[in-house]
Regions:
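Substrate-gating cap/lid alpha-helix
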Residues: 170-212, 237
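Conserved SGNH/GDSL esterase-like catalytic core that processes O-acyl groups on lipids
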Residues: 36-145
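A short helix->loop->beta-strand "cap" motif at the edges of active sites that frequently abuts
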Residues: 155-159
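Histidine-centered active-site loop/cap adjacent to the catalytic His
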Residues: 102, 226-250
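Alpha/beta-hydrolase-fold catalytic nucleophile elbow
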Residues: 121, 163-164
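Flexible glycine-rich surface loops and low-complexity tracts that mediate binding to linear polymers
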Residues: 10-13
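Short acidic/His/Gly/Ser-rich catalytic and metal-binding motifs that mark active-site loops
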Residues: 127-130, 169-175, 217-223
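Short glycine/proline- and charge-enriched loop/turn segments
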Residues: 83-88, 174-184, 221-229
Length: 250
């Protein structure tokens, strides 16, 4: 049993046959965070903790957008409201998360809300050789399967939309050598390879694959300059295009 309650984490219950009593195994939230999120920043932990508190008052069965920074920076709630969408929408994106970290915190970032509709965009931070070398692709896709398995195991017939990875741009005039090194694997070829496999995985689970990239891509298959912040992340004008592609599913 895992249940986050404020600053205390209930990690298990043992039954003592001699005393015929149950014993709760309790650890501090901060201690458990260090064990399962050792590479995470203090800011990421703080965001997740805040989401945990918000989940306690959130309404169940609503629409959820979840993932990493590309989801966190999506002003979906404001855009939806401005466009006359009255459905309650929650955003549980956390910048910098990879799929391993998402799996560790999947209860807070997804399951605890018991959403009826899920839009998920996670994994761009796995497109790197820093963690698992040239096995990054297989590792990413294996984790995506695990995420979907958990969703369908724990939730009652949710409507799931696996969102395609957005295009990146490695040729912006204001990029530094450091930023290009950080995102060097996010080429049009690798993004397309990932999206093709994501589509197969989504279809194998019977969920929806949603590609919102048609208005984001330039003639070279890269992110259009007018939307680009750093070549990965986008300004709100880019997200307005994304919203136009997915609004029919809200």
């Amino acid at each position: 049993i895992k249940q986050y309650t404020g600053d205390i984490l209930l990690v298990g219950i043992n039954y003592d046959k001699k005393t015929k009593k149950h014993q709760c195994l309790i650890e501090s939230y901060e201690k458990k965070e260090k064990e399962i999120g050792g590479t995470m920043t203090e800011e990421q932990r703080r965001k997740i903790k805040n989401y945990d508190y918000l989940n306690q008052i959130a309404l169940k069965g609503k629409t959820l957008f979840t993932g990493s920074s590309l989801m966190e920076m999506f002003p979906i709630c404001e855009i939806a409201r401005s466009r006359g969408i009255e459905e309650i929408v929650y955003n549980r994106g956390v910048g910098g998360l990879n799929t391993d970290e998402f799996l560790e915190y999947i209860h807070i970032l997804l399951l605890d809300l018991e959403p009826s509709k899920i839009f998920i965009n996670i994994g761009t931070n796995d497109i790197t050789e820093e963690r698992v070398g040239n096995q990054w692709f297989d590792h990413l896709m294996d984790n995506y399967r695990k995420i979907l398995e958990i969703i369908y195991e724990k939730l009652d017939k949710p409507e799931v939309y696996v969102m395609a990875f957005y295009p990146a741009n490695l040729h912006l005039p204001w990029q530094t050598a450091e930023s290009i090194e950080w995102m060097k694997l996010r080429t049009p070829e690798n993004i397309e390879r990932c999206n093709k496999e994501l589509k197969k995985i989504a279809e194998s689970f019977g969920c929806n694959y949603l590609n919102c990239n048609i208005d984001l891509i330039d003639k070279n298959g890269e992110q259009k300059t007018e939307y680009a912040i750093d070549g990965v992340h986008m300004y709100a004008n880019g997200y307005l295009k994304v919203f136009d592609s997915l609004v029919q599913y809200l």
